[in-house]
Every structure is written in structure tokens, then in C-alpha cells.
Amino acid sequence: MIYNGGKYNQHWSTKKLSELGTFSRGVSKHRPRNDTRLFENGKYPLIQTGDIKEANLYVTSHSQEYGEFGLKQSKLWDKGTLCITIAANIAETAILAYPMCFPDSVVGFNANSNESSELFMYYVFEYIRNSIQNSASGSIQDNINICLL
């Protein structure tokens, strides 16, 4: 989809999102997700889609923490990663204020610095959110596929 092909951005070239950076799905391999072993001696911040929806640009707090067992089945994402929700809360975005883990209902985006930035892409996703939400497919709970991005 191409938005705003007007005279003010004629010096920009049209690019696929995948050319602007790397999209990777969050990780939460272990089931059930509420297994207490995941959280024992927790010290690795964990956020969910609701935390991203509630954030104002940056995710600055978390309410859960993985322990070593939890981290082994997940991934600790770098500060500055743009988070994009793909399930439950569709196309909500926020940038990590510090390293955190997130589940597979979230996609992380890290920009190619010579092409874009996470901050710029945050605003791009704010602009196209409704279009992405309208593309969501699901019966009871909407979701989108990472390929849609």
C-alpha cells in the first residue's frame, strides 16, 4: 500500500518495509505460558500486547519478569526495538525503553540505520494502523501474519 504520494515527498523512493529494517517475531516457546517455572527468580522484563497498547511512544515499565528458565525459551530484545502487536491488540506500537522480552504475539522491528529509524517507523505505523487493523483476520480474536508487514 502506498500512502501520500504527494509533491512533498518526491525525493523519497518507494520501499518495502522489509527493506527498511528487520522484522522478527517475539518468542514464547514454552506451554503453558503461565507455568510458574518461567517466572522463578525473575529478573528479565516481560511485556505483553496490552503493555504496548497502553504505552505512550516508549514502553517504560513492565509487570512480569522471566527467570533463567523463562529467558531460555524467549529472547531479550534490545532497548530501542520497535514493538508491533499482531494478535489481540492489532498494530499497536511502542519502542522499548530498556531491554525486555515479549511473546510471539508481538513483532520486533530494528531499522537499517541508513534507511530509517525505529522512531520514524513508529509514526509510519501510527499512520497506517487502521489499514492494518482492517486487514486482520480471525474469528474470535483478530490477528495478522508477520508476512502482512
Model-found features: residue ranges?
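A generic structural signal for residues embedded in beta-strands
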Residues: 84-85
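DNA target-recognition patches
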Residues: 18-24, 33-68
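Short, well-ordered loop/turn elements at secondary-structure boundaries
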Residues: 40-42, 77-80
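Short beta-alpha junctions and helix-cap segments that line functional grooves
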Residues: 32-34, 95-96
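Short glycine-rich, flexible loops that bind phosphorylated cofactors or substrates
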Residues: 92
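Non-catalytic DNA-recognition/assembly elements of restriction-modification systems
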Residues: 1-30
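Basic, amphipathic alpha-helical recognition segments used for DNA target recognition
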Residues: 16-22, 53-60, 73-79, 95-101, ...
